[in-house]
Amino acid sequence: MSSAEWIVAIATCGRQTLLRRTVEHLVKAGIREAGATVVIAENGGSTWARPLAAEYKSHCKIEYISLKKRGKTHALNAVVNNYRTSFIWFLDDDVRVTKDAVLAYRRVFEAGLVGREFYGGPLGIDCEQPPEHWLRQYLPRSATGWNKCEGNNATNAFFLGANWAAWAADLLKCGGFDEHLGPGRTGVGDEEDVQRKLIATGLNPVYLENAMVYHWVPRDRCSPRWVLRRAFNMGRLEGSRIDFSCPLLFGRPRWMFREAAVRLGRWLATRFDRDPEQRFRTAYELVFFLGWMLEAKQRNRSQSNGTSESK
């Protein structure tokens, strides 16, 4: 391994068809000519991606890592630790890469600004079936696409996990990815968390306007049911960031029971509303708050256990 390599890191778990599509588009976009190494980090104990990596060795430089523990952030930390001096472009296993993106990331790799910058580009969407118009406001940027508005500072909108890059040395310095977050864990929050830490260490986020990558969105990833599951996980994440140092009832702050009752009442009152958005909105608000309540109980329980063990 050279002192500084350019790595394209793809964490995957049991999605061979989508992974093949991603690698194929990397090859078509000229990843071999750009001098990058594709690293597939398969987590969850399976090795289904190993034959695919072997198959593409004649098309690009590609390496494979197998990890027993499940979790995207665990897989990405493994890549960071294995390629500690490298520049790492993080992609999801369900994206379509453009030639312009490959060229844009190669340029910033060659600039070698370790300890100064990290990078991200816009995200387009390859959608299997467009969602209902009213549902779009509840969908994450990974399902609707993202392009930094002109004049906005990049720190106001964190880069999406399907298309961003940083030097491994900078990620190691800030502690890497939080393995309690991300797909396989909470399902949300991993890239925002690590980018916050990079900014806290003094790095500047740089937007690569031409580095377009397209994210595949199947119909079940932009459905009301999927959005509600995500809202629950978002509630858990937000709950974990709040200090609940107040009187408790059954392991939870008392005011939460009052708020939960209010939200439950709103949901029940709209169960038969003719407006699907109104029905969904009250369900979303309730489910988000239930996730928040669950995390509050878990945190206080873990704090109590820690106190008991120390006695």
Task: Give the location of each predicted region.
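Short, flexible, basic/aromatic active-site loop/helix in glycosyltransferases
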Residues: 122, 138-157
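Short, well-formed alpha-helical segments that are part of the catalytic scaffolds
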Residues: 15-29
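A conserved acidic beta->alpha catalytic loop
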Residues: 40-51, 95
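Conserved donor NDP-sugar-binding/catalytic core segment of glycosyltransferases
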Residues: 100-134
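Acidic donor-binding loop at a coil-to-helix junction in glycosyltransferase catalytic cores
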Residues: 183-196
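Glycine-rich, basic loop-to-helix element that forms the pyrophosphate-binding segment
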Residues: 67-83
